[in-house]
Amino acid sequence: MDLLHSWGVELAVYLQTRYGKYEGLFDLASTVADLHTTFFWLFPIWFHLRRDTALRLIWVAVIGDWLNLVLKWVLFGERPYWWVHETKFYGAGPAPSLQQFPITCETGPGSPSGHAMGAAGVWYVMVTALLSIAREKQCPPLLYRFLYIGLWMLMGLVELVVCISRVYMAAHFPHQVIAGIITGTLVAEVVSKEKWIYSASLKKYFLITLFLTSFAVGFYVLLKALDVDLLWTMEKAQKWCIRPEWVHLDSAPFASLLRNMGSLFGLGLGLHSPFYKTTKMRIMSAPLRIGCIVISVSLLHLLDGWTFSPENHMTFYALSFGKSAVALLIPTTLVPWALSKIYPVKTEGKNL
Protein backbone atom coordinates (compact mmCIF):
# COMPACT_ATOMS: atom_id res chain seq x y z
CA MET A 1 0.00 0.00 0.00
CA ASP A 2 2.91 2.37 0.61
CA LEU A 3 3.71 2.42 -3.10
CA LEU A 4 0.07 3.20 -3.93
CA HIS A 5 0.03 5.91 -1.28
CA SER A 6 3.27 7.41 -2.63
CA TRP A 7 1.74 7.69 -6.10
CA GLY A 8 -1.23 9.49 -4.55
CA VAL A 9 1.05 11.92 -2.74
CA GLU A 10 2.96 12.60 -5.98
CA LEU A 11 -0.33 13.39 -7.72
CA ALA A 12 -1.39 15.69 -4.88
CA VAL A 13 1.93 17.56 -5.04
CA TYR A 14 1.60 17.85 -8.82
CA LEU A 15 -1.93 19.24 -8.55
CA GLN A 16 -0.98 21.70 -5.82
CA THR A 17 2.04 22.87 -7.83
CA ARG A 18 0.47 23.14 -11.27
CA TYR A 19 -3.14 24.01 -10.49
CA GLY A 20 -2.90 26.19 -7.39
CA LYS A 21 -4.82 28.96 -9.17
CA TYR A 22 -7.89 26.70 -9.14
CA GLU A 23 -7.88 26.37 -5.36
CA GLY A 24 -11.18 28.25 -5.12
CA LEU A 25 -12.85 25.86 -7.57
CA PHE A 26 -11.54 22.80 -5.72
CA ASP A 27 -12.67 24.23 -2.38
CA LEU A 28 -16.14 24.90 -3.83
CA ALA A 29 -16.32 21.38 -5.29
CA SER A 30 -15.52 19.78 -1.93
CA THR A 31 -18.01 22.01 -0.15
CA VAL A 32 -20.84 21.33 -2.59
CA ALA A 33 -20.10 17.58 -2.60
CA ASP A 34 -20.62 17.45 1.16
CA LEU A 35 -23.99 15.91 2.11
CA HIS A 36 -24.78 19.12 3.96
CA THR A 37 -25.69 20.52 0.52
CA THR A 38 -28.14 17.67 -0.02
CA PHE A 39 -29.95 18.20 3.28
CA PHE A 40 -29.98 22.01 3.33
CA TRP A 41 -30.32 22.85 -0.39
CA LEU A 42 -31.20 20.01 -2.73
CA PHE A 43 -33.83 18.32 -0.56
CA PRO A 44 -36.09 21.38 0.00
CA ILE A 45 -35.95 22.18 -3.72
CA TRP A 46 -36.76 18.67 -4.92
CA PHE A 47 -39.37 18.09 -2.20
CA HIS A 48 -41.59 20.84 -3.56
CA LEU A 49 -40.97 19.91 -7.18
CA ARG A 50 -40.94 16.11 -7.15
CA ARG A 51 -41.52 14.50 -3.76
CA ASP A 52 -40.41 10.96 -4.66
CA THR A 53 -37.02 12.19 -5.86
CA ALA A 54 -36.52 14.15 -2.64
CA LEU A 55 -37.26 11.06 -0.54
CA ARG A 56 -34.87 9.01 -2.62
CA LEU A 57 -32.17 11.65 -2.12
CA ILE A 58 -32.43 11.37 1.65
CA TRP A 59 -32.50 7.58 1.73
CA VAL A 60 -29.52 7.30 -0.62
CA ALA A 61 -27.57 9.95 1.31
CA VAL A 62 -28.26 8.42 4.72
CA ILE A 63 -27.72 4.77 3.79
CA GLY A 64 -24.66 5.67 1.73
CA ASP A 65 -23.02 7.71 4.47
CA TRP A 66 -23.82 5.04 7.08
CA LEU A 67 -22.18 2.41 4.88
CA ASN A 68 -19.26 4.77 4.33
CA LEU A 69 -18.77 4.98 8.10
CA VAL A 70 -18.77 1.19 8.51
CA LEU A 71 -16.38 0.71 5.58
CA LYS A 72 -14.00 3.32 6.98
CA TRP A 73 -13.90 1.46 10.29
CA VAL A 74 -13.11 -1.77 8.45
CA LEU A 75 -10.63 -0.50 5.86
CA PHE A 76 -8.54 1.78 8.11
CA GLY A 77 -7.71 4.14 5.25
CA GLU A 78 -4.88 6.60 5.73
CA ARG A 79 -5.05 10.25 4.69
CA PRO A 80 -2.21 11.92 2.74
CA TYR A 81 -1.74 14.84 5.12
CA TRP A 82 -0.70 12.59 7.99
CA TRP A 83 0.63 9.55 6.09
CA VAL A 84 3.40 11.57 4.44
CA HIS A 85 4.78 12.44 7.91
CA GLU A 86 4.56 8.97 9.47
CA THR A 87 5.52 6.60 6.67
CA LYS A 88 8.98 5.03 6.45
CA PHE A 89 8.59 4.70 2.68
CA TYR A 90 10.91 7.65 1.99
CA GLY A 91 13.62 6.37 4.34
CA ALA A 92 16.17 8.95 5.41
CA GLY A 93 15.31 11.22 2.50
CA PRO A 94 12.95 14.19 2.72
CA ALA A 95 9.23 13.50 2.41
CA PRO A 96 7.21 15.42 -0.18
CA SER A 97 5.80 18.71 1.05
CA LEU A 98 2.00 18.79 1.02
CA GLN A 99 -0.01 21.95 1.52
CA GLN A 100 -2.96 21.88 3.92
CA PHE A 101 -6.21 23.81 3.73
CA PRO A 102 -9.09 24.54 6.15
CA ILE A 103 -11.00 21.48 4.86
CA THR A 104 -7.98 19.13 4.74
CA CYS A 105 -7.90 17.95 8.34
CA GLU A 106 -10.85 15.58 8.51
CA THR A 107 -10.76 13.32 11.54
CA GLY A 108 -12.07 10.01 10.19
CA PRO A 109 -10.34 7.26 8.19
CA GLY A 110 -9.91 8.00 4.48
CA SER A 111 -11.32 5.04 2.58
CA PRO A 112 -13.67 5.25 0.80
CA SER A 113 -14.05 8.97 0.21
CA GLY A 114 -17.31 10.19 1.71
CA HIS A 115 -17.46 13.22 -0.58
CA ALA A 116 -16.99 11.17 -3.74
CA MET A 117 -19.42 8.53 -2.50
CA GLY A 118 -22.09 11.02 -1.49
CA ALA A 119 -21.78 13.05 -4.68
CA ALA A 120 -22.03 9.91 -6.83
CA GLY A 121 -25.18 8.74 -5.06
CA VAL A 122 -26.89 12.12 -5.06
CA TRP A 123 -26.10 12.89 -8.70
CA TYR A 124 -27.20 9.41 -9.76
CA VAL A 125 -30.59 10.07 -8.16
CA MET A 126 -30.96 13.49 -9.79
CA VAL A 127 -29.86 12.37 -13.25
CA THR A 128 -32.19 9.36 -13.27
CA ALA A 129 -35.03 11.57 -11.98
CA LEU A 130 -34.55 14.11 -14.78
CA LEU A 131 -34.45 11.35 -17.38
CA SER A 132 -37.62 9.86 -15.89
CA ILE A 133 -39.35 13.25 -16.18
CA ALA A 134 -38.24 13.50 -19.81
CA ARG A 135 -39.78 10.10 -20.54
CA GLU A 136 -43.01 11.07 -18.80
CA LYS A 137 -43.21 14.23 -20.90
CA GLN A 138 -42.71 12.05 -24.00
CA CYS A 139 -39.53 13.83 -25.01
CA PRO A 140 -38.64 13.26 -28.71
CA PRO A 141 -36.19 10.34 -29.09
CA LEU A 142 -33.34 12.43 -30.52
CA LEU A 143 -33.68 15.12 -27.87
CA TYR A 144 -33.91 12.46 -25.17
CA ARG A 145 -30.70 10.87 -26.43
CA PHE A 146 -28.86 14.20 -26.29
CA LEU A 147 -30.29 14.79 -22.81
CA TYR A 148 -29.25 11.29 -21.71
CA ILE A 149 -25.67 11.72 -22.91
CA GLY A 150 -25.44 15.29 -21.63
CA LEU A 151 -26.65 14.54 -18.10
CA TRP A 152 -24.38 11.53 -17.61
CA MET A 153 -21.43 13.49 -19.00
CA LEU A 154 -22.25 16.33 -16.60
CA MET A 155 -22.32 13.88 -13.70
CA GLY A 156 -18.98 12.47 -14.82
CA LEU A 157 -17.47 15.95 -15.02
CA VAL A 158 -18.76 16.86 -11.56
CA GLU A 159 -17.37 13.64 -10.10
CA LEU A 160 -14.01 14.28 -11.77
CA VAL A 161 -13.76 17.76 -10.26
CA VAL A 162 -14.83 16.48 -6.83
CA CYS A 163 -12.24 13.69 -6.94
CA ILE A 164 -9.48 16.04 -8.06
CA SER A 165 -10.44 18.47 -5.30
CA ARG A 166 -10.19 15.79 -2.61
CA VAL A 167 -6.73 14.75 -3.82
CA TYR A 168 -5.65 18.38 -4.22
CA MET A 169 -6.70 19.13 -0.63
CA ALA A 170 -4.53 16.19 0.57
CA ALA A 171 -7.63 14.70 2.20
CA HIS A 172 -7.73 11.52 0.09
CA PHE A 173 -5.65 9.25 -2.10
CA PRO A 174 -6.85 8.61 -5.68
CA HIS A 175 -7.89 5.01 -5.02
CA GLN A 176 -10.10 6.20 -2.15
CA VAL A 177 -12.11 8.58 -4.32
CA ILE A 178 -12.49 5.92 -7.03
CA ALA A 179 -13.79 3.49 -4.40
CA GLY A 180 -16.20 6.19 -3.24
CA ILE A 181 -17.65 6.72 -6.71
CA ILE A 182 -18.21 3.00 -7.29
CA THR A 183 -19.75 2.40 -3.85
CA GLY A 184 -21.95 5.51 -3.99
CA THR A 185 -23.33 4.58 -7.39
CA LEU A 186 -24.09 1.02 -6.27
CA VAL A 187 -25.90 2.29 -3.15
CA ALA A 188 -28.00 4.68 -5.25
CA GLU A 189 -28.87 1.93 -7.72
CA VAL A 190 -29.93 -0.52 -4.99
CA VAL A 191 -31.90 2.00 -2.90
CA SER A 192 -33.63 3.41 -5.99
CA LYS A 193 -35.16 0.00 -6.70
CA GLU A 194 -36.86 -0.10 -3.29
CA LYS A 195 -40.43 1.20 -3.59
CA TRP A 196 -41.34 0.97 0.10
CA ILE A 197 -39.24 4.04 0.94
CA TYR A 198 -41.97 6.23 -0.57
CA SER A 199 -44.66 4.94 1.81
CA ALA A 200 -42.71 3.91 4.92
CA SER A 201 -44.60 4.34 8.19
CA LEU A 202 -43.33 6.40 11.11
CA LYS A 203 -42.72 3.15 12.97
CA LYS A 204 -40.49 1.94 10.14
CA TYR A 205 -38.56 5.21 10.13
CA PHE A 206 -38.04 4.88 13.88
CA LEU A 207 -36.99 1.22 13.71
CA ILE A 208 -34.57 1.77 10.82
CA THR A 209 -33.04 4.78 12.56
CA LEU A 210 -32.68 2.72 15.74
CA PHE A 211 -31.22 -0.26 13.86
CA LEU A 212 -28.64 1.76 11.93
CA THR A 213 -27.56 3.62 15.06
CA SER A 214 -27.44 0.47 17.19
CA PHE A 215 -25.52 -1.47 14.55
CA ALA A 216 -22.87 1.25 14.23
CA VAL A 217 -22.51 1.68 17.99
CA GLY A 218 -22.54 -2.09 18.55
CA PHE A 219 -19.91 -2.59 15.85
CA TYR A 220 -17.80 0.10 17.49
CA VAL A 221 -18.12 -1.56 20.91
CA LEU A 222 -17.30 -4.99 19.46
CA LEU A 223 -14.13 -3.76 17.78
CA LYS A 224 -13.24 -1.83 20.91
CA ALA A 225 -13.57 -5.07 22.91
CA LEU A 226 -11.19 -6.68 20.40
CA ASP A 227 -8.70 -3.92 21.25
CA VAL A 228 -9.22 -2.10 17.96
CA ASP A 229 -9.01 1.67 18.38
CA LEU A 230 -11.50 3.17 15.94
CA LEU A 231 -10.63 6.70 16.97
CA TRP A 232 -6.97 6.36 15.99
CA THR A 233 -7.41 8.96 13.29
CA MET A 234 -8.39 11.71 15.73
CA GLU A 235 -4.93 11.66 17.30
CA LYS A 236 -3.26 11.78 13.89
CA ALA A 237 -5.41 14.69 12.79
CA GLN A 238 -4.61 16.67 15.92
CA LYS A 239 -0.91 15.84 15.62
CA TRP A 240 -0.30 16.63 11.96
CA CYS A 241 -2.79 19.35 11.10
CA ILE A 242 -0.84 22.61 10.90
CA ARG A 243 -3.72 24.64 12.37
CA PRO A 244 -5.54 23.24 15.44
CA GLU A 245 -8.72 25.14 14.53
CA TRP A 246 -8.92 23.19 11.27
CA VAL A 247 -9.60 19.97 13.17
CA HIS A 248 -13.38 19.84 13.53
CA LEU A 249 -15.37 17.41 15.64
CA ASP A 250 -18.22 17.54 13.12
CA SER A 251 -16.07 15.51 10.72
CA ALA A 252 -15.68 12.72 13.30
CA PRO A 253 -17.46 9.39 12.60
CA PHE A 254 -20.07 9.63 15.37
CA ALA A 255 -20.94 13.23 14.49
CA SER A 256 -21.68 12.12 10.94
CA LEU A 257 -23.71 9.15 12.17
CA LEU A 258 -25.91 11.24 14.47
CA ARG A 259 -26.49 13.91 11.82
CA ASN A 260 -27.66 11.33 9.31
CA MET A 261 -29.87 9.52 11.79
CA GLY A 262 -31.40 12.85 12.80
CA SER A 263 -32.14 13.60 9.15
CA LEU A 264 -33.81 10.23 8.58
CA PHE A 265 -35.88 10.45 11.74
CA GLY A 266 -36.79 14.07 10.99
CA LEU A 267 -38.02 13.01 7.55
CA GLY A 268 -40.22 10.35 9.12
CA LEU A 269 -41.65 12.83 11.63
CA GLY A 270 -42.30 15.38 8.91
CA LEU A 271 -44.08 12.99 6.56
CA HIS A 272 -46.35 11.66 9.31
CA SER A 273 -47.14 14.85 11.20
CA PRO A 274 -50.73 16.16 11.24
CA PHE A 275 -49.49 19.37 9.58
CA TYR A 276 -48.13 17.43 6.60
CA LYS A 277 -51.30 15.39 6.23
CA THR A 278 -53.25 18.66 6.04
CA THR A 279 -51.06 20.23 3.35
CA LYS A 280 -50.71 16.97 1.39
CA MET A 281 -54.42 17.07 0.54
CA ARG A 282 -54.14 20.57 -0.93
CA ILE A 283 -53.34 21.49 -4.51
CA MET A 284 -50.14 23.55 -4.41
CA SER A 285 -49.87 26.16 -7.15
CA ALA A 286 -46.52 26.94 -8.79
CA PRO A 287 -46.08 30.28 -6.93
CA LEU A 288 -46.84 28.56 -3.63
CA ARG A 289 -44.28 25.84 -4.37
CA ILE A 290 -41.67 28.46 -5.20
CA GLY A 291 -42.55 30.27 -1.99
CA CYS A 292 -42.09 27.06 -0.02
CA ILE A 293 -38.67 26.52 -1.61
CA VAL A 294 -37.44 30.07 -1.01
CA ILE A 295 -38.66 30.25 2.60
CA SER A 296 -37.44 26.73 3.42
CA VAL A 297 -33.96 27.39 2.07
CA SER A 298 -33.84 30.74 3.90
CA LEU A 299 -34.85 29.19 7.21
CA LEU A 300 -32.40 26.35 6.75
CA HIS A 301 -29.66 28.90 6.13
CA LEU A 302 -30.52 30.51 9.47
CA LEU A 303 -30.61 27.11 11.17
CA ASP A 304 -27.24 26.27 9.66
CA GLY A 305 -25.77 29.25 11.47
CA TRP A 306 -26.64 27.64 14.80
CA THR A 307 -23.41 26.10 16.06
CA PHE A 308 -22.55 24.63 19.44
CA SER A 309 -19.43 23.91 21.45
CA PRO A 310 -17.80 20.49 20.99
CA GLU A 311 -16.38 20.49 24.51
CA ASN A 312 -19.05 18.07 25.77
CA HIS A 313 -19.22 15.31 23.17
CA MET A 314 -22.56 13.86 24.26
CA THR A 315 -24.26 17.26 24.20
CA PHE A 316 -22.67 18.01 20.82
CA TYR A 317 -23.94 14.74 19.33
CA ALA A 318 -27.43 15.17 20.78
CA LEU A 319 -27.73 18.71 19.43
CA SER A 320 -26.42 17.56 16.04
CA PHE A 321 -29.17 14.93 15.93
CA GLY A 322 -31.84 17.46 16.87
CA LYS A 323 -30.62 20.10 14.43
CA SER A 324 -30.64 17.60 11.57
CA ALA A 325 -34.17 16.47 12.44
CA VAL A 326 -35.45 20.05 12.49
CA ALA A 327 -33.74 20.68 9.13
CA LEU A 328 -36.01 18.05 7.55
CA LEU A 329 -39.14 19.18 9.40
CA ILE A 330 -38.89 22.73 8.05
CA PRO A 331 -39.40 21.99 4.31
CA THR A 332 -41.63 18.93 4.72
CA THR A 333 -44.11 20.25 7.26
CA LEU A 334 -43.63 23.61 8.92
CA VAL A 335 -43.26 25.90 5.90
CA PRO A 336 -46.00 24.31 3.70
CA TRP A 337 -48.43 24.30 6.63
CA ALA A 338 -47.71 27.95 7.50
CA LEU A 339 -48.10 29.10 3.90
CA SER A 340 -51.30 27.11 3.43
CA LYS A 341 -52.75 28.96 6.43
CA ILE A 342 -51.71 32.34 5.08
CA TYR A 343 -52.74 31.61 1.49
CA PRO A 344 -55.64 29.12 1.47
CA VAL A 345 -55.52 26.72 -1.48
CA LYS A 346 -57.91 24.22 -2.95
CA THR A 347 -58.29 20.80 -1.42
CA GLU A 348 -58.10 17.70 -3.57
CA GLY A 349 -61.36 15.82 -3.83
CA LYS A 350 -63.41 13.62 -6.07
CA ASN A 351 -65.90 15.09 -8.50
CA LEU A 352 -69.43 14.01 -7.64
Curated annotation (Swiss-Prot):
The active site is at H115, H172. Its EC number is 3.1.3.9. Its main location: endoplasmic reticulum. Substrate binds at R79, R166. Hydrolyzes glucose-6-phosphate to glucose in the endoplasmic reticulum. Forms with the glucose-6-phosphate transporter (SLC37A4/G6PT) the complex responsible for glucose production in the terminal step of glycogenolysis and gluconeogenesis. Hence, it is the key enzyme in homeostatic regulation of blood glucose levels. GO terms for cellular component: endoplasmic reticulum membrane. It comes from the Eukaryota. This is Glucose-6-phosphatase catalytic subunit 1. Pathway: Carbohydrate biosynthesis; gluconeogenesis. It catalyses: D-glucose 6-phosphate + H2O = D-glucose + phosphate. A motif (Prevents secretion from ER) lies at residues 349-352. It is a multi-pass membrane protein. It holds the Pfam family PAP2. GO terms for molecular function: glucose-6-phosphatase activity. GO terms for biological process: gluconeogenesis; glucose 6-phosphate metabolic process. Keywords: Endoplasmic reticulum, Gluconeogenesis, Hydrolase, Membrane, Transmembrane, Transmembrane helix.
